[in-house]
């Protein structure tokens, strides 16, 4: 084993970091110690994960994550459509002036209100009903789904809980939902278009305890409708 790789693996931070990466966690600069470890040993750990048919990716924004291949020994899974939509709205908010005005802190309710403003209401209602319109009860069900999505995205490292329950700060890792807009002159406007058009953006695996599926390339999820679940192949930002 190369000396520098042995040094990385021997680091007391590595076991927990390895577990986080395998669960789908994104390691951004806010996670100071783990991020510094990945920066120092990026090449060596990249070679290490190749043995598991996975790629250690450093995104243009500086955060790290694992990208399993179809033959990977590391489990892969999918995100539900509502998770994808919430992620795209988070990315939009990250790019917005409101983030600076709020010192980077948002509430669950603010995220939900922004979702209702930005997204197509008919598509939103279809996430909880088979109808294009919904009652107040349906909106409450949608809010519950949004809260569940935020908990999932928190485990993936997309948001960081702040103080009391219901407040969070958005991590740069949300750019996993904005890969298609990185090269656009107006990234905020391009992200808004993605939200309104309902276009999918590829995202890495969700934590295994949350609806985890081991997928072969192009495999279908026969027990989940196409409207409820994106059959994502988790191939990264490209």
From Swiss-Prot:
Annotated Gene Ontology cellular component terms: cytoplasm; nucleoid
GO annotation (BP), single: cell division
InterPro entries with a match to the protein in the record: MukE_C (IPR042037), MukE_N (IPR042038), Scp_MukE (IPR007385)
Disulfide bonds: none
Biased composition (Basic and acidic residues): 218-238
Region (Disordered): 206-238
Keyword annotations: Cell cycle, Cell division, Chromosome partition, Cytoplasm, DNA condensation
Subcellular compartments: Cytoplasm, Nucleoid
Described function: Involved in chromosome condensation, segregation and cell cycle progression. May participate in facilitating chromosome segregation by condensation DNA from both sides of a centrally located replisome during cell division. Probably acts via its interaction with MukB and MukF.
Family (UniProt): Belongs to the MukE family.
Assembly notes: Interacts, and probably forms a ternary complex, with MukF and MukB. The complex formation is stimulated by calcium or magnesium.
NCBIfam families reported in the protein's UniProt record: PRK05256.1
Protein name: Chromosome partition protein MukE
Organism: Aliivibrio salmonicida (strain LFI1238)
């Amino acid at each position: 084993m190369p000396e520098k790789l042995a040094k990385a693996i021997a680091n007391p931070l590595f076991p927990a970091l390895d577990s986080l990466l395998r669960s789908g966690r994104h390691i951004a600069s806010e996670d100071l110690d783990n991020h510094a470890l990945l920066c120092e040993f990026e090449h060596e750990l990249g070679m290490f994960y190749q043995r598991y048919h996975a790629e250690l990716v450093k995104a243009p924004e500086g955060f790290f994550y694992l990208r399993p291949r179809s033959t990977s020994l590391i489990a892969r899974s999918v995100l539900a459509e509502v998770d994808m939509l919430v992620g795209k709205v988070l990315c939009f908010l990250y790019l917005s002036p409101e983030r600076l005005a709020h010192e980077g802190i948002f509430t669950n309710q603010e995220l939900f209100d922004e979702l209702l403003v930005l997204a197509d209401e008919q598509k939103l209602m279809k996430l909880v009903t088979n109808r294009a319109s919904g009652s107040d009860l349906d909106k409450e069900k949608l809010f519950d789904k949004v809260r569940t999505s935020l908990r999932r995205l928190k485990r993936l490292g997309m948001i960081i809980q702040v103080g009391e329950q219901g407040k969070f700060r958005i991590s740069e890792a949300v750019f996993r939902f904005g890969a298609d807009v990185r090269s656009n002159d107006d990234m905020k406007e391009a992200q808004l278009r993605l939200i309104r058009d309902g276009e999918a953006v590829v995202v890495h695996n969700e934590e295994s305890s949350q609806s985890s599926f081991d997928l072969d390339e192009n495999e279908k999820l026969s027990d989940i409708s196409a409207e409820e679940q994106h059959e994502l192949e988790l191939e990264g930002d490209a």
